[in-house]
């Protein structure tokens, strides 16, 4: 599509169907950086990243979406992607045990489930739980849309490599709400979209991708939105967490290592706190408490 990760929205003039097209090559590479995930887990995270970007683009408000696989008895105990309406993404996975290169979703997760959490900047949080009945993340999320919004939705996700670097992209088709539905038209557009090749998604401009798929259709392509990796960790957040720990626990950690090393699983950053830092934090927290009371 382009040298930078972007999400494009598009609309069919003669059908009550809208679409999205996204490429997340660079963001995907940053999610995988500093981690030694098995190839099957890398692929799964790429699929989840694409899906989260496409889902986030459906938000009509400022807020966050988290797509999380909670493992059951499989070796993949957790896989999660966080995104927001600004298309800022991050993700991480946890693995305990061996995962072969050709492991399926069910083999990795076991009797787990998919959790979609939508958190508006203002308003109540919504959470949907989907059983892993589909063979892919895309199939599971299509079930989610039918359960939660009753809107026929199809996702087409591709992962792979370009010049030996991880690449991922995808497309979403969805029937417009409050419109008269024509299942045959939607199925026809879905069949066309399913022919998209991975290398086309990874490398071609959006307008060329849409022309190759829908050259007999009238399609409006809207201005793109940039997609990026962004971690929300900070030294202050770590400090806020430390002051909630019991003094004995903090003292024990300091005695063992001489400092407390707080490591962010998402981006790999380390935040070190020594005894002087801890004392300053505790004193500051105590002073704040005195002011409150």
UniProtKB/Swiss-Prot annotation:
Q: Which UniProt keywords apply?
A: Chaperone, Cytoplasm, Disulfide bond, Redox-active center, Zinc
What does the UniProt record tell us about how this protein is modified after translation? Under oxidizing conditions two disulfide bonds are formed involving the reactive cysteines. Under reducing conditions zinc is bound to the reactive cysteines and the protein is inactive.
Question: Does the entry feature the keyword Zinc, yes or no?
Answer: yes
Question: Example GO biological process term?
Answer: protein refolding
UniProt GO molecular function: protein folding chaperone; unfolded protein binding
Cystine bridges: 231-233, 264-267
- Keyword set includes Disulfide bond: yes
Q: Main subcellular localization, coarse class?
A: cytoplasm
Q: Where in the cell is it found?
A: Cytoplasm
Q: Which domain of life is it from?
A: Bacteria
Q: Which GO terms describe its cellular component?
A: cytoplasm
* Protein function: Redox regulated molecular chaperone. Protects both thermally unfolding and oxidatively damaged proteins from irreversible aggregation. Plays an important role in the bacterial defense system toward oxidative stress.
Q: Which PANTHER family match?
A: 33 KDA CHAPERONIN (PTHR30111:SF1)
Protein family according to the UniProt entry: Belongs to the HSP33 family.
Protein's name in the database: 33 kDa chaperonin
């Amino acid at each position: 599509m382009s040298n930078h990760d972007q999400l494009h929205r598009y609309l069919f003039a003669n059908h009550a169907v809208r679409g999205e097209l996204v490429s997340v090559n660079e963001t995907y590479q940053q999610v995988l950086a500093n981690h030694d995930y098995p190839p099957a887990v890398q692929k799964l995270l790429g699929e989840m990243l694409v899906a989260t970007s496409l889902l986030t683009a459906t938000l009509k408000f400022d807020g966050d979406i988290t797509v999380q696989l909670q493992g059951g008895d499989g070796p993949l105990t957790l896989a999660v992607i966080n995104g927001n309406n600004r298309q800022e993404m991050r993700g991480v996975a946890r693995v305990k045990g061996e995962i072969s290169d050709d492991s399926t979703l069910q083999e990795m997760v076991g009797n787990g489930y998919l959790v979609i959490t939508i958190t508006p900047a203002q308003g109540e949080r919504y959470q949907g739980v989907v059983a892993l009945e589909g063979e892919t993340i895309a199939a599971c999320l299509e079930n989610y849309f039918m359960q939660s919004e009753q809107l026929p939705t199809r996702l087409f996700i591709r992962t792979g490599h370009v010049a030996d670097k991880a690449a991922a992209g995808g497309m979403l088709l969805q029937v417009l709400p409050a419109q008269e539905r024509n299942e045959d038209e939607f199925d026809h557009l879905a069949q066309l979209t399913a022919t998209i090749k991975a290398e086309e998604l990874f490398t071609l401009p959006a307008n060329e991708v849409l022309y190759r798929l829908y050259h007999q259709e009238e399609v409006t392509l809207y201005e793109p939105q940039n997609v990026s990796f962004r971690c929300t960790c900070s030294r202050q957040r770590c400090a806020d967490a430390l002051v909630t720990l019991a003094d004995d626990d903090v003292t024990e950690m300091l005695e063992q290592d001489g400092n407390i090393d707080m490591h962010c699983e998402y981006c790999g950053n380390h935040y070190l706190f020594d005894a002087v830092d801890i004392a300053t934090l505790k004193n500051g927290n105590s002073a704040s408490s005195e002011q409150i009371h």
